[in-house]
Amino acid sequence: GVPNWDVVQVEAEELTLGCADGFYEKLDWDKLGGKDKFLPAAVNDCGVGAIVWSTAIAYDGDKLKEGPTSWADFWDVQKFPGKRSLRRGPKYSLEFALMADGVPPAEVYKVLSTPEGVDRAFKKLDELKPHIVWWESGAQPLQLLASGEVVMTTAYNGRIAGINKSEGKNFKIVWPGSIYAIDSWVILKNSPNKDAAMDFIAFASQPENQVKLPEYVAYGLPNKEAANAVPAALQADLPTAPENLAGALALDADFWVDNIEELNKRFNAWLAQ
């Protein structure tokens, strides 16, 4: 049938699945200036990155003068006594556990793609399990941090920057070992306005237009030229700032599309133990 919408912003797994299943039109990359203009993780036959957002460690700089700097610190309840908070589910939790166990970011999905790697991640989660408060919605971790219920948490970078700005908090982000994900523009299959939709995506993807986004919300920019043009005062809060991107890991949507069902079952069984 004819879709109700022409252009939609989708998360990484939705992009992977929808493109494979023929739900989206193929993009005209010539209109976008070529694939090399964008972060590699922002490039797909059916979609182009719209925003980049990260999940990272956050802590209250007013309460912890010397905060954590790594996932090993997040797991170290002797050095940093108190509860921690993680997003409920295997996605992110398993990657963070492997990094806490010494796996370099670039090798996380290689390790996690083996049965031994999955066992290793769950074994590492076992260590922290008594100290974890699980969160499910994006507002929860910052509420837990503000109330003092947890000493550190994972959280979305845009939320952290937003509450610092709106409520004068001093929540700090630990960028090394953060995981960034990209939401992408797609055109729904059989859109009657395909050409206009492509023109809109091209307009939204131009560096001079993307560069305005961080003034309103601390999302990173998939267009490399736009990311480099962000004013210095705003760069520190963005996943795409060069120093923040350097130690970060791109979410592997293909891995999660292939493994989410099985790992969800295992995670839920583990949680119930």
Predicted segments with their positions:
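Extracytoplasmic ligand-binding site segments that recognize negatively charged/polar headgroups
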Residues: 2-146
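Paired acidic/hydrophobic, glycine-rich loop segments that form the ligand-binding mouth/hinge
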Residues: 6-9, 134-135, 151-156, 172
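A ligand-binding cleft/hinge motif common to bilobed small-molecule-binding domains
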Residues: 15-17, 152-170
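Solvent-exposed, polar/charged alpha-helical surfaces in well-ordered, non-transmembrane soluble domains
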Residues: 16, 72, 119, 123, ...
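Periplasmic-binding protein-like
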Residues: 37, 53-55, 118-127, 165-191, ...
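A bilobed periplasmic-binding-protein/Venus flytrap-type ligand-binding module shared by bacterial periplasmic
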Residues: 54-63, 98-100, 182-196, 212-216
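Mature extracytoplasmic/periplasmic domains
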Residues: 188-248
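Conserved C-terminal helix/tail region of periplasmic/extracytoplasmic solute-binding proteins
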Residues: 243-273
